[in-house]
């Protein structure tokens, strides 16, 4: 996992913690499960809102999670909003920074992304995931970053976000 991806996860965690929303709720769902309602909430916030990231810091081995964070960007206002989904609860929060490249088209759901990452060497007991665009211009692609954990020796795997094709893996040096 790149340092940029780690910073993005840290930003999302900080947004949730400082919003006082915490991270824990019963029940698990895949990343795609809350997308429709999250998008509705974001469109009410800003009509031109586009999805730029989906992530969770507490993912189960089957690729489901109790909490998902959907980041949206408004090109007109240049503002960001994170919709936190916990079970059947949806809460939007405007934040100061985030990603602006929109996720366009279909993407692999989190259950398949975690399964593909495991096939390609993902290792660890504290799974977190993030789906976002990477690259510049016509080289921009959609990626799943599937992190096995942050302990020394844990392995994170990056996959093509649409197909699940292996891109790379990184071994965590430990902190």
Language model features with spans:
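Long, terminal "pre-/pro-" and other extracytoplasmic accessory regions
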Residues: 2-11, 16-175
């Amino acid at each position: 996992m790149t340092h940029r991806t780690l910073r993005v996860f840290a930003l999302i965690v900080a947004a949730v913690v400082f919003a006082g929303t915490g991270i824990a709720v019963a029940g698990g769902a895949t990343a795609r499960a809350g997308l429709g309602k999250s998008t509705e909430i974001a469109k009410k916030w800003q009509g031109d809102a586009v999805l730029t990231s989906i992530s969770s810091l507490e993912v189960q081995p089957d690729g489901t999670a109790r909490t998902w964070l959907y980041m949206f960007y408004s090109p007109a206002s240049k503002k960001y909003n994170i919709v936190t989904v916990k079970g059947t609860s949806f809460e939007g929060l405007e934040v100061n920074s985030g990603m602006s490249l929109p996720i366009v088209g279909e993407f692999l759901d989190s259950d398949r992304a975690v399964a593909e990452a495991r096939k390609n060497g993902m290792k660890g007991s504290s799974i977190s995931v993030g789906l976002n665009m990477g690259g510049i211009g016509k080289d921009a692609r959609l990626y799943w970053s599937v992190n096995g954990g942050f302990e020394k020796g844990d392995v994170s795997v990056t996959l093509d976000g649409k197909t699940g094709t292996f891109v790379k893996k990184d071994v965590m040096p430990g902190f």
